[in-house]
Structures are given as structure tokens and as C-alpha cells.
Regions:
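HhH-family (HhH-GPD) DNA N-glycosylase catalytic core used in base-excision repair
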Residues: 1-308
Length: 308
């Protein structure tokens, strides 16, 4: 089927290279950023589509070119829906300048922002995906967790074949709810995590857990409290889920070892800090503390030296 193409403008500033760089080590059959191109399979109207996204603008005048490929004809109404998904995934409508103004008195953060101008935090297509990933990542290194996540996706997610390449989409609750626990464990999950994932999927299908209702809550704290009612979901998991799945930028997963390490690297001379100490430092960032934490993680990942 002939691919469809369209352009999307983003609220400036926006830098695709910085914003998608977190996917540079991704699995090319699932989601990856390489040589200025990002691609991922998504669901649209019960069909799978492969998106390829490239930048055609500048940081202060950002524009993206999106190519959509599918096995089926894509209706114009579905292209609009796909456009909205791209806007959500890369947070294209977010006004980021107020964040820069808010933290301008923090000299360290100000210097990091100068190097990462236009970085926006990606958001998962669904809250379910953010929850599952956060459960998988409990008490694991990111490398180990991503390996397990990829195995879950390739084992149970739907796939699409295009030009002799197979691509996989994230599993839905329907894909996971009725699995044998051993099937999930074969992906590298512990027995408990396999239980949590299957039980969460089943509770969504049985309408016992309403993730859409969680999204409609006004306050981040209420969202976290609601998610913590799910078996296997504690405060850290819920904070990670609302930050990466709903873009709640006031959520700071201070119990995260990687985040504390990045905060310490830039603010405390790499001395180990506690969750409370991380929260104390984060008070400087107000309602933007989750985004500020993300900037620190990316800066640390890139090995930025802000002393020069």
C-alpha cells in the first residue's frame, strides 16, 4: 500500500534529535531513533500502522514530516487521529518556555537547558503501556528491564509485515490477560511481576480498573493514589506511570536510583543522596520538577559537561 505523508508543526522550541534520543538504543522491530529518523508501530482504528518521523524545520520553527504505512488503505479521518498520536507521543503542543523561566534562578539547571534547548519528554501512547513498563522496571537496571519489555512485546504484541520486515506493537490488556504465568516468566519476568501484569490486564477487561477514569482526575496526587490501589503498584511505579504515560510534569519519582544519581551528579558532586534529599533539591523546580528531572537524566546520559 502506498504510504501517506503529512507535516506537523510543533510549539517551539522543539528538538526532535534530543527528544527522540532516548530511543536510540531501541529495538528496530519495535521503536527506534537512528540517523534523524524515528519509527514505531501504533494502533489506529483496529489496524496497525508504521510511523516514520523526521524533522524538516528548526528548533525555533519546528516541523515534522510523518510517513504512515499500513497493509490497508488509511482513511483521511484516521490520518487526523494518527497526527494526534504523534503530537501526544512527542508532547508537541507543550509550552516549554514557562519551564525555562521558572527555573532560571537555578544556575545549574539553566546551563543544562542551554545545552538541551527544545527537549520535550516523550509520552507513551497509553497509560497501560506506561504502567506495564514501570512494573517491569521495578528494582532492575534499565538495560535488563528494556530487554524484558522487548521480549514481552515480541512474544505477545500484534505484528505487521512491511517490505519483508516484521514490526511489533505493544500488547493490549486483551493480549496479556489470559496468558499462563509461565508464558510471561519466559520473557524474564519474576513470578510476582508476571502476576501483577496479568492481573492488571484482567482487571481492565473486567472493568474493575478504569485507567480512562484515572486520566480524568484533576490532581497528580489523586492519580497516584488511584494507581497505588493496583496490586504491585507502589508510589514509585505510579509516579513513573503518570510522568511517562500522562505527562504529569509535577511527578518526581525520587525513589528512582537513576534519577537520584543524575541529581547528585550535577548538584551534589556524585555523593549518594536519599529520596528526601532529592525532593528537597527538586523544590527549586516547582511544578516542573518531573521535567527538570528528565533534563538531568538526559544530560547525564549524554555526558554533558556544564562547567565549560
Amino acid at each position: 500500500m502506498k504510504p501517506s505523508k503529512f507535516s506537523i508543526s510543533a510549539v517551539p522550541p522543539f528538538n526532535l534529535d534530543l527528544s527522540a534520543r532516548i530511543f536510540a538504543d531501541g529495538d528496530p522491530q519495535i521503536r527506534k531513533y537512528e540517523n534523524g529518523r524515528f519509527w514505531q508501530v501504533l494502533r489506529n482504528d483496529n489496524s496497525l500502522v508504521l510511523l516514520t518521523i523526521e524533522s524538516s524545520g528548526e528548533v525555533e520553527n519546528p516541523e515534522l514530516v510523518v510517513e504512515v504505512r499500513s497493509k490497508e488503505e488509511i482513511a483521511s479521518k484516521n490520518l487526523k487521529s494518527i497526527s494526534n498520536m504523534v503530537i501526544n507521543i512527542f508532547n508537541l503542543n507543550m509550552e516549554i518556555n514557562p519551564f525555562y523561566v521558572e527555573v532560571a534562578s537555578d544556575d545549574i539547571m539553566k546551563r543544562i537547558i542551554c545545552r538541551l534547548q527544545g527537549l520535550k519528554n516523550p509520552i507513551t501512547p497509553t497509560l497501560f503501556e506506561a504502567l506495564i513498563d514501570s512494573i517491569v522496571e521495578q528494582q532492575l537496571s534499565l538495560k535488563a528491564a528494556h530487554s524484558i519489555e522487548n521480549r514481552v512485546i515480541k512474544s505477545f504484541g500484534p505484528s505487521i509485515s512491511l517490505d519483508n520486515e516484521i514490526y511489533y506493537a505493544y500488547p493490549t490488556p486483551e493480549n496479556l490477560a489470559f496468558l499462563e504465568l509461565q508464558e510471561l516468566r519466559n520473557c524474564g519476568l519474576s513470578f510476582r511481576k508476571a502476576e501483577y501484569i496479568r492481573d492488571l490486564s484482567l482487571s481492565i477487561l473486567n472493568h474493575e480498573m478504569d485507567l480512562e477514569g484515572v486520566k480524568k482526575l484533576d490532581k497528580t496526587e489523586g492519580m497516584i493514589d488511584e494507581l497505588c490501589k493496583i496490586r504491585g503498584v507502589g508510589v514509585w511505579t505510579a509516579e513513573m506511570a503518570v510522568l511517562r504515560g500522562l505527562g504529569r510534569l509535577d511527578a518526581l519519582p525520587a525513589d528512582d536510583i537513576g534519577l537520584r544519581r543524575s541529581i547528585s551528579h550535577f548538584y551534589c558532586g556524585d555523593v549518594r543522596i536519599s529520596s528526601d534529599e532529592a525532593r528537597q533539591i527538586a523544590q527549586n523546580w516547582g511544578k516542573w520538577r518531573g521535567l527538570a528531572g528528565y533534563y538531568l537524566i538526559v544530560a547525564d546520559m549524554m555526558g554533558l559537561n556544564i562547567d565549560n
